[in-house]
Amino acid sequence: MTKINMTFSEEELARMAAEFEQKINEEKERLAKLKDIYTKLFGELSLTDKLAKFIENDSWVKRISNYFKANRELMAELSIIDVTDFGSYMDEFFIKELKDNFTFVDLNFDKLDLPDEDIELWEKSTVFWFTTGLWLVTVEGTDYIVHELSGQGETLYFINTVDDFIVNDPNAKRNLSADDLTKFAEQFKEFALKCKN
């Protein structure tokens, strides 16, 4: 069997290290430019106003979409494919800003104490499929749920109040009866507040 020689000279290693460092610096510059755009789009808003717009969704997405359409050359320069790609960066900057200013309480499913039939109800809702993060954050006395989902190389964030998180979830509304939806919402709120305390 032929062995492949994987040894490199000092010059080759130095060149590869320099190329790697250059790529890291280019990505840092790219992210800094995107962060500047985030500040330009949402910087004049308070965190609570940003939170309201994020939950409302339409006005949040409209700002992002309008900026993308008006700055297509810049988007291409930043290797942004489409509005969704651009929006994912804006969403991540906002979530990071929330985390930097408020305490995120991890909702640990190990604290979930339910009979099997209720666990099946939660699974039937499909709300937590592809979940990679679930937190409770309290802003000005109101409890919110921050839901992170990942799949196919994309990360999405959804936020709603602890009271509305389940009842407004499209998957839960589609997959559960009205009575089951109410039961699920009550159980989830109890679980979330238990994790908080």
Question: What does each model-identified segment do?
Answer:
Residues 12, 25-27, 32, 47, ...:
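Intrinsically disordered, low-complexity regions enriched in serine, threonine, proline
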Residues 153-197:
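Ampiphathic alpha-helical segments that act as solvent-exposed interaction surfaces
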Residues 2-9:
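Acidic, low-complexity intrinsically disordered segments
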Residues 9-12, 16:
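Surface positions of alpha-helical coiled-coils, especially the charged/polar e/g heptad sites
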Residues 62-172:
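Acidic, low-complexity, intrinsically disordered interaction modules
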